[in-house]
C-alpha cells in the first residue's frame, strides 16, 4: 500500500500518520493550538491541512518538519469543514463563526468571505468547481455561486433542526444531508437553485455526525453517535452493512479512491479500516490518548497539474 496517506487527529493535540497495511504510527505532529476538527490531503499529496479552533495549518507530508509551512488565519471560531479545488488551486473552510472562506493555498490571507448568519457545520464543493454547498446550525442548506459571489439557493430539510453534514456525489447526481435526529435527506440537483427532495430516511436513531458519498457513487456512509457506521446502496438507499466495532461515537470517515475501503475515526481513541465488500474491520489504529474525530485516507494518484493562473 505504498503511496497511501492515512492520518488521524482529534482531542490529544496531535496528528498521527500511519502505515495503513501494518497499523504502525510512522510520524506524530504536535498541534498545540487546539483540538483538530478536520484533516484534508491536498490533491498533489504533498501537504495535509489541519483545521482547529480557530486556525488552519498546512503541514508537509513527506518531511520531518514538525512545524506548519503555512497558516491560514481569519476565522474566529471552530473550523468545522474544509476542502480543495480539484487541482489544489484554492481551499475552502467553514466555521462556527458563521462564515465560509476561500484561500489561495500559495498566499497569505483570505480571498473571499461568505456570511451564513449561523454556525457552519459542513461545506462541500460541487464537482463543477463553481458552487459551494453549506449546512448550518439553523437548519439551512445554502448553495453559493462562486462566479456571481451570491447565495443562489437556500432550503431547510427539517425546519430549524441543525443540519450536521452535507455531501455531493462526484457525478453531481445526488446531494445528501443529515441531522442530529439521525435523518438523512437525499436530493437530486436539478439546477444551481433547484434541489429536489428524492428520499428521506431514518438512518440512525441518534446523531448522524458525518455522511459521505464514495468516489464511484456506489455507497453512502453515515457515521453516528450510536457507535456504528452504516453503508447504504446509493441506487435505492437500501442498507448494505452496519459496521460495528467502535466503542464510542464515530465522528468521521474517508473512502479509498476506488471505494473498496473506508477509514473511520472514533471517540474510543482509535481509527479503523473496513472492507466494504464484507463489512469487516481489517485493522485498528491505536495510539491517540483522547477522542479521534477526523481521518484522512488518500490512496489516489497524486494530481501534479500546475494550478492555472487567474
Task: Cite the ranges covered by each PLM segment.
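Loop/turn segments within WD40 beta-propeller blades
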Residues: 1-3, 39-45, 83-88, 124-129, ...
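Conserved strand-to-loop turn within each blade of WD40 beta-propeller repeats
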Residues: 9-12, 51-54, 94-97, 135-138, ...
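A conserved positional marker within WD40/Gbeta-like beta-propeller blades
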Residues: 14, 55-57, 76, 90, ...
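WD40-repeat beta-propellers
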Residues: 15-18, 56-61, 100-104, 141-145, ...
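Short C-terminal beta-strands that terminate individual repeats in beta-propeller domains
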Residues: 25-32, 68-74, 110-116, 151-158, ...
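Canonical WD40 repeat/beta-propeller blade segments in eukaryotic WD-repeat proteins
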Residues: 34-40, 77-83, 118-125, 160-168, ...
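Terminal intrinsically disordered, low-complexity extensions flanking WD-repeat/beta-propeller proteins
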Residues: 283-284, 288-310
Amino acid at each position: 500500500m505504498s503511496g497511501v496517506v492515512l492520518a488521524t487527529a482529534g482531542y490529544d493535540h496531535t496528528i498521527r500518520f500511519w502505515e495503513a497495511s501494518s497499523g504502525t504510527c510512522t510520524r506524530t505532529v504536535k498541534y498545540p493550538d487546539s483540538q483538530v476538527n478536520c484533516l484534508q490531503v491536498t490533491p498533489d499529496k504533498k501537504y495535509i491541512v489541519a483545521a482547529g479552533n480557530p486556525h488552519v495549518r498546512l503541514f508537509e507530508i513527506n518531511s520531518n518538519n514538525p512545524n506548519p509551512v503555512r497558516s491560514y488565519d481569519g476565522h474566529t471560531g471552530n473550523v468545522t469543514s474544509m476542502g480543495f479545488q480539484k487541482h489544489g488551486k484554492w481551499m475552502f473552510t467553514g466555521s462556527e463563526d458563521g462564515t465560509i472562506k476561500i484561500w489561495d493555498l500559495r498566499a497569505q490571507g483570505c480571498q473571499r468571505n461568505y456570511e451564513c448568519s449561523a454556525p457552519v457545520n459542513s461545506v462541500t464543493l460541487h464537482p463543477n468547481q463553481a458552487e459551494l454547498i453549506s449546512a448550518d446550525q439553523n437548519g439551512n442548506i445554502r448553495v453559493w455561486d462562486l462566479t456571481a459571489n451570491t447565495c443562489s439557493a437556500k432550503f431547510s430539510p427539517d425546519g430549524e433542526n441543525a443540519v450536521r453534514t452535507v455531501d455531493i456525489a462526484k457525478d453531481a447526481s445526488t446531494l445528501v444531508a443529515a441531522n442530529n435526529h439521525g435523518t438523512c435527506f437525499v436530493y437530486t440537483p436539478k439546477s444551481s437553485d433547484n434541489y429536489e427532495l428524492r428520499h428521506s430516511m431514518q438512518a440512525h436513531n441518534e446523531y448522524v455526525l458525518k455522511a459521505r458519498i464514495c468516489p464511484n457513487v456506489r455507497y453512502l456512509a453515515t457515521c453516528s453517535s450510536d457507535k456504528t457506521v452504516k453503508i447504504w446502496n446509493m441506487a435505492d438507499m437500501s442498507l448494505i452493512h452496519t459496521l460495528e466495532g467502535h466503542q464510542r461515537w464515530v465522528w468521521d470517515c474517508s473512502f479509498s479512491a476506488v471505494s473498496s475501503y473506508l477509514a473511520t475515526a472514533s471517540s474510543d481513541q482509535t481509527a479503523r479500516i473496513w472492507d466494504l465488500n464484507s463489512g469487516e474491520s481489517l485493522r485498528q489504529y491505536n495510539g491517540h490518548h483522547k477522542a479521534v474525530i477526523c481521518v484522512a485516507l488518500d490512496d489516489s494518484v497524486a494530481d501534479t497539474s500546475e494550478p492555472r493562473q487567474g
